[in-house]
Every structure is written in C-alpha cells, then in structure tokens.
C-alpha cells in the first residue's frame, strides 16, 4: 500500500483592485507595449490599504475548503508559503488558522520566495506520507506590491498580489504512476546566487526594503533550472514529458514559461497561463493557476500535471501530481 497526497479541493482569491499596464504608465517611464513584449503581463491585482497577506490567504483557504466540502477543523495542518507575511512573527499560517476558526492541528510558514508553493507541497506530501497529517491545507499568498521600488521601471511592473490554496488528503494508491495525487517532488537551492534576486531589508536593516533583481541572470538560470528539475521529477515518477497533460508553471514571465516549455518539448497549448492577468504573484502564482485552470475547465480529474518554480536564494523545484 502506498499513501498518496491527493488534491481534494482548490480555491483562490484576488484583491478587487485591478491595475492595467496603462495605469503604470503614469507612475514610471514605461509603456503597455514595453511591459507586454518583455513579460506578457497585461494587468495585475493590488491589495487594498490595510489588506494583508493573511487576509488574502484566508479568503483563498475558505474557497478551497468549500470546494473540498470540508470545515476548518477537518484540517490537520496548515502551511502558508509566503515572503510577505504580515509581521516578522507570528507566522502568517497561525494568523490564517485563527481567521478560519481552526481549534486543532498545527500551522507554519514556508519561505522560498517564488518557489515557496512547490516547497510547501513537498512538505505537505512528506507529512501525509509519514502519517503525521491526513489533511493539509497548503496556501500560497503574497502582497509583493508593497516591496516595489517605483523608480525601478524594469522590476516594479512585473509583480502583483493574490492567494491560492489546495486541500491535500491522504489516500491509498497502488504505488504506480497511474495513482492520483503527488507522485514525485524535486527541490534545490544554491545560496551562491543570492544577489541575483533579493529584498534589501529585514530585521538586520530595520526597514522593509525593496525587491532587487538582475533580470537577465535570473532569466538564464530559470530557463536552465526549471526544465531540468521538471525532467528530474518526471523521471522519479517513471514518466516523461510526453505523459504530461499540463505544465502549471510559476507565472513569472511569458518568455521564461515559453522557453521552459520548449526545452521540455511540451507545446504551449498544454501550459496553464495566468501571467497576463495576475503578473508575478510569487508563491501564490502556482495555486492561483491551478484554481483558475480548474475553473476554466482545462484541468480535469486524472490529468497529469507538472508544476515548477524558481525564486530568490536561488531556490527552485518541481512537483509531479495527478489531479
């Protein structure tokens, strides 16, 4: 008998405020054409004043619980992947736990920037496989709009706010690649590249800081490492790119997404795309794309999915799962 972490429900939340590229033209020296050409982004959502990452996460969590037909106290573990927690501590996860009215279980944050949701899924899978939890609510939530340097026109136009969530539940499988649930994970990091993508603030500086990125270098590493980790995870599952129904990538940049799909020899009509509507929502981007992909009728039960992401650290990884 093999225990698999199977998707029971999915949901997402986007703040009400939609910021089209045309609005950013008034803030920085840029154009709609420039942004679209370099990133594929047309619009993004920004959180309202006073609206926090944990607020977004709780809304997405409720949507995922409703989709699963579960109540908060049916959950054993709650994991939030975020780099923009409300406070230095306590964790965003415990704040969401309180907001949902959960009176049992345990909650914690995972911080791997844009790769955070992949890391969180791997943690949830390990908890379920080891028997430490049966139902895990995994959330990716970010308010990156608050980290932007609005004088850095190459970076500030790329990011948005949002949250997505999955409910994973342990279920018996046959131990084959035909099982539903998470089939394989692959995680990596290399701190030698920390200066390529980081925020120049934190407890040691006494300020929140702003996001700093060497875009060309990040692009180069992303295209190379994302295809590699996806192939590794597929190999662990005994599968190949030809078996993939959908790539659900981190929605950072359309050029990165396209180049990675090309390296994997997967056509773009088998890639879930939301970057045009959400921008880069960091750890929220993959669960947002999963939720939107299901709502569109693209992702169906039994489909084989590969999710992959890379973020500051550098940290990167992938998950192969059957929906």
From Swiss-Prot:
Keywords: Acyltransferase, Cytoplasm, Fatty acid biosynthesis, Fatty acid metabolism, Lipid biosynthesis, Lipid metabolism, Multifunctional enzyme, Transferase. GO terms for molecular function: 3-oxoacyl-[acyl-carrier-protein] synthase activity; beta-ketoacyl-acyl-carrier-protein synthase III activity. The keyword Isomerase does not apply. Its EC number is 2.3.1.180. It catalyses: malonyl-[ACP] + acetyl-CoA + H(+) = 3-oxobutanoyl-[ACP] + CO2 + CoA. Residues 251-255 are annotated as: ACP-binding. The active site is at 114, 250, 280. It holds the Pfam family ACP_syn_III. It is found in: Cytoplasm. GO terms for cellular component: cytoplasm. Pathway: Lipid metabolism; fatty acid biosynthesis. GO terms for biological process: fatty acid biosynthetic process; secondary metabolite biosynthetic process. The last Arg residue of the ACP-binding site is essential for the weak association between ACP/AcpP and FabH. Belongs to the thiolase-like superfamily. FabH family. Homodimer. Catalyzes the condensation reaction of fatty acid synthesis by the addition to an acyl acceptor of two carbons from malonyl-ACP. Catalyzes the first condensation reaction which initiates fatty acid synthesis and may therefore play a role in governing the total rate of fatty acid production. Possesses both acetoacetyl-ACP synthase and acetyl transacylase activities. Its substrate specificity determines the biosynthesis of branched-chain and/or straight-chain of fatty acids. This is Beta-ketoacyl-[acyl-carrier-protein] synthase III. The lineage of its organism: Bacteria, Pseudomonadati, Pseudomonadota, Alphaproteobacteria, Rhodobacterales. The gene is fabH.
